[in-house]
């Protein structure tokens, strides 16, 4: 991860100007089931998508659905940040999108099940408010899929 002190001044100032509000000490919702019963989805800000889904652009607040059965070889990355080193993703997609690992957790009964669809956003360039509409859409889709919890991989 790049340190703020390593960035050019203009970029450091841009990031510091975002000044997001703290999330606070409490969780958004209390878990009512043991982890071994949870249906879990993946959400990433790595800007990944299937080859046929279309690339993300820098100011893109949309999302791309990724099926739980998607093969890693058919997932590509169009994350636009020049500060993001993609070599880990190229080596192993599980670095940014642990699809194989979550299936292993389900097979070993550590979690209840894997959601039918996971979601990817492009996490660079926009204020959080820009994602409000698509976040509400994805939340509705997760509810339809009976998802209990999400593993977020912020990139």
Task: For each feature predicted by the language model, list its residue ranges.
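An N-terminal assembly and electron-transfer interface module characteristic of large anaerobic redox
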Residues: 1-155
């Amino acid at each position: 991860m790049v340190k703020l002190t390593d960035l050019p001044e203009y970029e450091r100032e841009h990031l510091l100007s975002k000044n997001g509000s703290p999330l606070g000490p409490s969780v958004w919702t209390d878990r009512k089931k043991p982890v071994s019963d949870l249906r879990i989805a993946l959400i990433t800000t790595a800007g990944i998508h299937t080859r046929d889904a279309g690339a993300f652009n820098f100011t893109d607040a949309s999302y791309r659905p990724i099926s739980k059965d998607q093969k890693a070889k058919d997932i590509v990355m169009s994350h636009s940040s020049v500060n993001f080193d993609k070599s880990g993703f190229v080596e192993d997609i599980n670095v940014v999108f642990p699809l194989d690992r979550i299936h292993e957790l389900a097979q070993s009964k550590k979690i209840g099940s894997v959601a039918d669809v996971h979601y990817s956003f492009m996490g660079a360039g926009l204020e959080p408010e820009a994602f409000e509409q698509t976040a509400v859409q994805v939340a509705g889709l997760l509810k339809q899929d009976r998802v209990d919890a999400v593993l977020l991989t912020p990139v």
